[in-house]
Structures are given as C-alpha cells and as structure tokens.
From Swiss-Prot:
InterPro entries: DNA_methylase_N6_adenine_CS (IPR002052), HemK-like (IPR004556), N5-glutamine_MTase (IPR050320), PrmC_N (IPR040758), RF_methyltr_PrmC (IPR019874), SAM-dependent_MTases_sf (IPR029063), Small_mtfrase_dom (IPR007848). Its EC number is 2.1.1.297. It is found in: Mitochondrion. GO terms for molecular function: nucleic acid binding; protein methyltransferase activity; protein-(glutamine-N5) methyltransferase activity. Belongs to the protein N5-glutamine methyltransferase family. GO terms for biological process: methylation. This is MTRF1L release factor glutamine methyltransferase.
Length: 340
C-alpha cells in the first residue's frame, strides 16, 4: 500500500509544466496502433502507452498505463490480472476505451479521476472532479486517530463509541474510514463545497455507512457556524486534512492539480494557517473536557501551530504530538484540550 501511495504522491506532486501545451496532446500526438507489430495485448498496450507518456513528460508513465489498462479489463491493478490476460488480444472496444482514457492522462487528468474511483484504507471510493483526491499519507492520519481511540478509551464515550467532527470531508475518505473501523462511532462531516457534500453522501451510501454520518454543507469560516454544530457537542474528536499549502507555493503545484482539483481545498493562505486557526478556535467550544484534534499539515506548521497556541492560552489547547509521514516529514499534529 505504501509503495502505491508513494506512486500517487509523485503523480500529484511533480513540478508544474507549461499548461498551455498540454491540451493539444490528447488525440493527435501518439503513434497509431497500426504501427505496432504482433497482437494488441494488455502487456503491449502498457508498453506502448508507457513510451507515449514518457515522450510527453507524463509522470509515473508505466504506473499510469498499468492502472488504465487494468481498469479497462476490470481489475484494480495490472499485477492482479490473471497472467492469461496479459497476452490475450484485446477487443476493438477495449482498445478504443484504453485510447480514450490514456488521452485524458495526456491532458494531465489525474488517474483517480480517469478511473472514477480510488482505494483508501481498503475502501473503494468514487472520485469526481474537482473534489479533492485523498492522498496516501492521509491514511496515516486515520491510523493515528484509530490508535488514539484504542489507547485512550476513557477519553471517548465508551458505550456509544466516539463522536467525531471532520472539517473538510471532500470525498469522505477520512470519515468513512473511521466509521468502517470504529463500528460504534458517529461522525458529523462538514464541507463548504456542495460537490464534496454530495460525493461524501454517495460514498457513504455505497459503503452502507449513511446511518452513522451527518453531512452538513457548512463553511467553518462563516459567522455563526458554531451554532450549527453545537447540537452535536460535546465531541470526542475533531479531525481534518484542511487546506494548508502556503499561497506562495500554489504556483508550483503539478498540472494534474491546477487543472482539475478544487484549489480552494489546497490554498491555506499566506502561511497555510487560515483554516487551521479557524479549526483551533472552533474546536474548544465543541470538544469534551479532554477532547483531541488531529490535523494533517505542512512540515513547516508544527512550529507555527505551537507558537500560535501559546499566544492563545484562552483556548486551553496544547500541541501534544507530532508525527512524520512515510517520507519522514512532520505531517500530523495531535492537539488536546485541557481543563481551564
């Protein structure tokens, strides 16, 4: 899982190229299949499109072509296909579908949007642009929350399971992972974008988890947003992968991100702290006496968040833990509420 996670990270993190050149590549710049010799098999298509992607500067060329060919053949990954299918000649319909999907990849559409689904914490989630694509490191945030619930059962309501708020639910990846692994838990999930609210609803229904989730179309930066959430307090946990990219870094994002994903879900303001500070200001009003906040952040944020909390002692919040992602960067924060 972590290997594929690193592949996904590369797909979504390469330096931004010249976007104006990309759109013309889709259907007029690859060699035709007629130039290929031998049967047009799955392996042949992977090799062909890998070369095309490499020629056009598409990141992770082989992985992209393998995912697409496997998808057309009804599998999650190329390696999971039966070996007999690797060399079996493809039908004209399959070849046409592969060409269409690879054309989208040439336009730098993320593989997740091309396939229309992606796995997260073992769950198959529908993916629709421009809703934010869950990154592999966010799985580690979920794992940390699960560890905390297991190690500190006294800090959550033992009988009913934890009551959790997710800020910025996107596709529902974090919320639905927690619901699926904490059978007695309940989640209130909020997002300011209607498309994200709709997609979380759909994914919850696909996974039959809709009975334990309340999804609210809400901007937590809006005045009076707390009044919409108070009926569910006191909460045990707040979890979020908020917009945290420094505004000056937005121009360096890959074309896959800039052209297709909702940039509002990424832009965290000048220091990437705009939504983070809103969450930290809101959470104490909703959490129980020893409730916790788990955040995914930029590696520069642990120091900034610690300093900000020290300058706001009235919130009664303390940074009690920092964890690194699989690349060794400080990526996750655990902030805990204490008694006044």
């Amino acid at each position: 899982m972590k290997l594929w996670g690193q592949i996904l990270w590369t797909l979504l993190s390469v330096p931004r190229g010249r976007r104006g050149v990309l759109q013309g590549w889709a259907f007029n710049s690859w060699k035709t299949y007629s130039s290929l010799t031998g049967p047009l098999s799955a392996t042949g298509m992977v090799n062909h499109w890998t070369r095309v992607f490499e020629e056009r500067g598409i990141p992770e060329a082989r992985e992209s072509s393998e995912y697409i060919v496997a998808h057309v053949l009804g599998a999650k990954t190329f390696q999971s296909l039966k070996p007999a299918l690797w060399t079996k000649p493809l039908t004209p319909q399959q070849l046409e579908c592969i060409q269409e999907l690879c054309g989208r990849r040439l336009q730098r559409m993320p593989v997740q949007y091309i396939l229309g689904e992606w796995d997260f914490q073992g769950l198959s989630l529908k993916m629709v642009p421009p809703v934010f694509i869950p990154r592999p490191e966010t799985e580690e945030l979920v794992e940390w929350v699960l560890e905390e619930v297991a190690q500190r059962p006294h800090a959550v309501r033992a009988q009913d399971g934890p009551l959790i708020l997710e800020v910025g639910c996107g596709s529902g990846a974090i919320t639905l992972s927690l619901l699926s692994q904490l059978p007695k838990s309940r989640v209130v999930a909020v997002d300011k974008e209607e498309a994200a609210v709709s997609l979380t609803h759909e994914n919850a229904q696909r996974l039959q988890l809709q009975d334990r989730i309340r999804i609210i179309h809400l901007d937590i930066t809006s005045e009076g947003c707390c009044t919409h959430l108070l009926p569910w307090s006191p909460l045990d946990l707040v979890v979020s992968n908020p917009p945290y990219i420094f505004r000056k870094d937005m121009e360096q994002l890959a074309p896959e991100i800039c052209s297709y994903e909702d940039l509002v879900a990424l832009d965290g303001g000048d220091e990437g702290m705009d939504i983070i500070t809103h969450i930290l200001t809101l959470a104490p009003q909703l959490l129980n006496a020893s409730g916790s906040i788990f955040l995914e952040v930029d590696p520069r944020h642990p120091e900034l968040v610690s300093s900000w909390l020290q300058s706001h002692p009235d919130l009664h919040l303390s940074l009690v833990g920092v964890r690194e992602d699989f690349c060794g960067r400080p990526r996750f924060l655990h902030v805990q509420k204490s008694a006044p």
